[in-house]
Amino acid sequence: MPVRVSEFSWQQTPATIFLSLPLRGVCVRDADVFCGESYLKVNFPPFLFELFLYAPIDDGKSKAKIGNDTILFTLYKKEPVLWDSLSVPGVDKEMMQRIREKSILQAQEKAKEATEAKAVAKREDQRYALGEMMKIEEEERKKIEDMKENERKKATSELEAWKECQKKADGQKRVQRKEKPLEGKQAEETKALKPRGLPRKAPPTRLPTRGRNWENIFPEKLKEDRVPAPRSAGSIQISFTPRVFPTALRESQVAEEEEWLHKQAEARRAMSTDLPEFFDLKEEERNPDWLKDKGNKLFATENYLAAVDAYNLAIRLNCKIPLLYLNRAACHLKLKNLHKAIEDSSKALELLTPPVADNANARMKAHVRRGTAFCQLELYVEGLQDYEAALKIDPANTVVQNDAEKIRNIIQGTALKSRD
């Protein structure tokens, strides 16, 4: 039975109560204080102090200061009046019990409201952070699009200027071609109109219509305006170099590696963007790779809930990409959703088949994350199995080796305790 304390001192003003309670040599760390509107309790074993207040107080503003083997309470009254006494007179056991229960229920409700308010504030902060990040990305995308548009306009204007120069040059060439035949014809006419001498019989002159000048002038124009004949058709043979994996020939897994490449190609084609629920999304938001990169950025900023949302949407668009499940498992580990982390790691391992060198790192991470989730659930044997599977993939990984050794020590220590 605790020893009830009745030694204390108090003073009051119309708005405040000042209460001093000695701790009687008890360590300050062992003192437990509970304060409600009508009830005050201090438990400092083996002593117990209870006070059923005369009138309600504002327990949210009231304060307690512990020091020098004394607790100093500053209690703020709800109504600024002087009290006749500090505690309610004539309180029986039933009334005390009712006041205790009522105070405890009020404290629980306030704690619940505070927790809910904190959760709402946290969600609002996360939503605000996600909105700000999306706004920044939208501004960057718009800036890039503006740069592209400016470059396109610049290239278009340069092309138009070049076309205009070409038109002017072609016009000048056509004018020069027209002037050359006229000059030749004028020269022939001038020669034909020269005066002839009387004593000498002039030879008969020929008209320049079908003479040598005809053959010299118009064939040049025809040669210049002649269009070359079209080229003969042909065919070009194209062959692609085969993809070669960096694997020794004695350890080669050509069939498995080809199967893995085939599965990767099928996974890239397995898109579900034609569903009605995705019509409102932007073009980049329908791209699983873009969503995966966005989830990675959110994970790096420790916004794990938003990262899970990004991976969820990417998986709904394409459920055949193993890295989406692997990254979402890492988020669930951070959020302590251990069973979901195990499910996502198992799904990633299911998609990372057949086992080849190209997916070895991803398989190792999947085993480690599933083993970590098992260990946090205190299923150390299952966790050790996953860590050993990871070591088979990457035997030189010292971090995984150290973690596996710690798990073995835990299992051996548990076995020794059970024997004792």
Swiss-Prot record:
Spans of repeat TPR: 288-321, 322-355, 364-397
Main location: nucleus
Keywords, ordered alphabetically: Cell projection, Cytoplasm, Neurogenesis, Nucleus, Repeat, TPR repeat
CS domain location: 3-87
SMART domains: TPR (SM00028)
One of the GO BP terms on file: learning or memory
GO molecular function: nuclear estrogen receptor binding
Compositional bias annotation for Basic and acidic residues: 164-192
InterPro entries recorded: CS_dom, CS_DYX1C1, Dynein_assembly_factor_4, HSP20-like_chaperone, TPR-like_helical_dom_sf, TPR_rpt
Function: Involved in neuronal migration during development of the cerebral neocortex. May regulate the stability and proteasomal degradation of the estrogen receptors that play an important role in neuronal differentiation, survival and plasticity. Axonemal dynein assembly factor required for ciliary motility.
Protein name: Dynein axonemal assembly factor 4
Organism, scientific name: Mus musculus (Mouse)
Lineage: Eukaryota, Metazoa, Chordata, Craniata, Vertebrata
